[in-house]
Swiss-Prot record:
The organism's place on the tree of life at top rank: Bacteria
Membership in a protein family: Belongs to the thiamine kinase family.
Gene3D superfamilies noted in UniProt: 3.90.1200.10
Cysteine disulfide links: none
Enzyme Commission number, as recorded: 2.7.1.89
Name of the protein this chain belongs to: Thiamine kinase
Pathway per the UniProt entry: Cofactor biosynthesis; thiamine diphosphate biosynthesis; thiamine phosphate from thiamine: step 1/1
GO biological-process terms attached to the record: thiamine diphosphate biosynthetic process; thiamine metabolic process
Reactions performed catalytically: thiamine + ATP = thiamine phosphate + ADP + H(+)
Length: 274
C-alpha cells in the first residue's frame, strides 16, 4: 500500500496512524540494520524500515518498495506500507548466520531471482563511481583514484551476458535461513543488470568459494562455467571501485573510522588486481 505524502512523519505518528495496535519489540534486533525496528501484535510481526542513506534520492527508496511489491514471498519480504522515509514489510522468521550457505543452495536462490520479471530500472555503476568521487573528502582524492575512474569511463561497462533483476548486496547478513528455504532482505540496491555483476558482487570468503558459486550457477543456467567466470572477472574492477568509493563517501558522511579502514583495504585490493 503506497501512501503519498510530502510531509515527513515521526515514528510515533506512523504507528498511531497506521498500526495503532502494534508495539515495538525493543529487545529484538536479529537481521535488522540501519534505522529498522520490529513491531508486533498478537504474534504478527512487521519490520519498519528507513533509508540507510539519508542523502540518497527518494526514488531509491521507492525502487526498493516496488521491487519488493513484485517479488515472490518465497525469496523476499512483502511490503505493506510505503510513504516518505518509511516502509513497513513482513518480518522473515529464521536465522541470519555469519557465513554464506552452501554454494549450490545460494546459486539456486540467485538463479530463481534472476528468472523473475525485470524491475524496470537499470543498475549503472559509472554515475555512482562519479558521485562517490565528487562527494568524498577532497583530502582523500588521489591521482590514482582519478586515473582508475577515467580508465573505467573510457572502457565502459561490460556488455551484459544476461539481463535480469538483481539484489546487488548478497552477503551472509542479508540471507535469512528460514524453514521454507533461503530468503534475501535489504533490497535497497536492487535493479536490473548483468547476472555476472550479481555473482561478482557476492561477499565471498575466498576465490575458491567464488569459483564454486559461479560453477554451480552456470550448471543451473546452462552456461559454460569458464565463460561465466570470465564475465564475472570483467566486473571486478568496477565493483572494487564501487566499494572503495562507497566507503570513502560513507567516511565523509559519518566520520566513522571503520570506513577509512575498509576503503584503504579495498584500494590495496585494486592495486593487486591491476
Amino acid at each position: 500500500m503506497p501512501f503519498r505524502s510530502n510531509n515527513p512523519i515521526t515514528r510515533d505518528e506512523l504507528l498511531s496512524r497506521f498500526f495503532p495496535q502494534f508495539h515495538p519489540v525493543t529487545t529484538f534486533n536479529s537481521g535488522l540494520s540501519g534505522g529498522s525496528f520490529l513491531i508486533e501484535h498478537q504474534g504478527q510481526r512487521f519490520v519498519v524500515r528507513q533509508p540507510h542513506d539519508p542523502d540518497a534520492p527518494q526514488s531509491a527508496f521507492l525502487h526498493q518498495y516496488r521491487a519488493l511489491s513484485q517479488l515472490p514471498a518465497c525469496i523476499a519480504p512483502k511490503p505493506h506500507l510505503y510513504l516518505r522515509d518509511w516502509m513497513v514489510v513482513d518480518y522473515l522468521p529464521g536465522e541470519v548466520k555469519t557465513y554464506l550457505p552452501d554454494t549450490n543452495e545460494l546459486a539456486g536462490l540467485l538463479y530463481y531471482l534472476h528468472q523473475q520479471p525485470r524491475f524496470g530500472w537499470r543498475i549503472t555503476l559509472l554515475p555512482l563511481l562519479e558521485l562517490y568521487w565528487q562527494q568524498s573528502d577532497p583530502a582523500r582524492r588521489t591521482v590514482g583514484w582519478l586515473r582508475m575512474l577515467k580508465r573505467l569511463r573510457k572502457a565502459r561497462e561490460p556488455r551484459p551476458l544476461r539481463l535480469s533483476p538483481l539484489h546487488m548486496d548478497v552477503h551472509a547478513g542479508n540471507l535469512v535461513h528460514s524453514a521454507s528455504g533461503l530468503k534475501l532482505i535489504d533490497w535497497e540496491y536492487a535493479g536490473d543488470g548483468d547476472i555476472a555483476l550479481e555473482l561478482a558482487a557476492v561477499w565471498v570468503e575466498n576465490t575458491e568459494q567464488h569459483r564454486q558459486l559461479v560453477n554451480d550457477y552456470a550448471t543451473r543456467a546452462k552456461i559454460y562455467p569458464a565463460q561465466l567466470w570470465r564475465q564475472v572477472r570483467r566486473w571486478f574492477p568496477w565493483l572494487l571501485m564501487l566499494k572503495a568509493g562507497w566507503f570513502e563517501y560513507r567516511w565523509r558522511q559519518t566520520g566513522d573510522q571503520q570506513f577509512i579502514r575498509l576503503a584503504d583495504d579495498t584500494w590495496r585490493q585494486l592495486l593487486i588486481k591491476q
